[in-house]
Design a protein with these regions (language model features):
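Extracytoplasmic soluble-region selector
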Residues: 1-43
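Collagenous Gly-X-Y triple-helix signature in extracellular proteins
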Residues: 44-275
Length: 275
């Protein structure tokens, strides 16, 4: 397509090519020399796992991700690092799509929300040696004291375990964020999550529900179940059930080191009747 001095070439597939532009001589000018340029096209493929994180991010930013992929599609990542004292060495896990532009008016537009993760097709939760226990030592805990005081915003899980005390480019040391692949961290975007950020047995109080900016987050009760039983009843007014769970997919997760063993997995909603 030629428009004045601009030549536009539309890509029809991904790959590399050399484009040569030539102009014939006219009645009042001689033919100029040919011009060549090399181009690389990174159009997404419909198999999510075949795309790199830059390509996925570009489709997300353009608002076209759901033209290529579907809720539930998976992409493998390798987690590698020490996460609050628990060593994870080259663990391959599939992240899966929870939804596109989920709750966009509140949480941010042009985003793909993923969950970690699955091993093969089995949903898993990352479990350390502290699973099922309470205490003050480091571990995959909500808090290092047996309380939900301060809600999600000030929790040990949010800031230290997941690493929201830092950023993807400068993650909190020994956090899950720091153990994620650098290519994934390079394209991560924050979302605005609404949660009871007071807790401490204060009950159903609307003003307790405030926002946080999170790169990694646990899901809320309503986001998984589409109903509320134990969360502050006002949380659901700011939340939407994820399309993945709305479609009826299993909510059961299994231990990442023993995929036949079902485990409890954390949600970020504080129990409104307990401290």
């Amino acid at each position: 397509n030629v428009n004045g001095t601009t030549v536009t070439v539309n890509a029809v597939g991904k790959g590399n090519a050399t484009i040569t532009v030539s102009v014939a001589e006219g009645t009042n000018y001689t033919a100029p020399a040919n011009k060549t340029c090399s181009v690389s096209v990174t159009l997404p493929t419909t198999t999510l796992n075949d795309n790199d994180w830059d390509t996925i991010s570009e489709a997300s930013a353009a608002g076209t991700a759901d033209d290529y992929w579907a809720v539930g599609d998976t992409k493998s990542i390798v987690i590698n690092g020490n996460v609050v004292g628990f060593g994870i060495t080259n663990l391959t896990v599939n992240v899966f799509i929870l939804g596109f532009n989920h709750n966009a008016s509140r949480e941010g537009s042009n985003r793909i929300h993923f969950q970690i993760g699955k091993i093969g097709a089995t949903p898993v939760a990352l479990c350390d040696s502290q699973y099922g226990s309470s205490g003050s030592s480091q571990g995959f805990r909500m808090n290092t004291s047996n309380t939900n005081n301060g809600g999600w915003a000030s929790s040990y899980m949010r800031n230290t375990v997941l690493g929201n005390g830092g950023t993807p480019s400068s993650p909190t040391a020994n956090s899950l964020m720091a153990a994620l692949p650098s290519a994934l961290r390079a394209v991560m975007k924050a979302v605005t999550k609404y949660t009871d950020n007071v807790g401490n047995d204060t009950g159903n109080v609307q003003s307790n529900v405030t926002s946080t900016q999170d790169y990694l987050f646990l899901l809320a009760e309503f986001e998984v179940f589409g109903t509320r039983n134990w969360a502050n009843s006002y949380e659901q007014n700011y939340q939407v059930q994820y399309a993945y769970y709305q479609a009826g997919n299993s909510r059961i997760a299994y231990r990442h080191t023993s995929t036949a063993s079902a485990v409890w997995w954390w949600l970020r909603s504080p129990n409104y009747t307990n401290t």
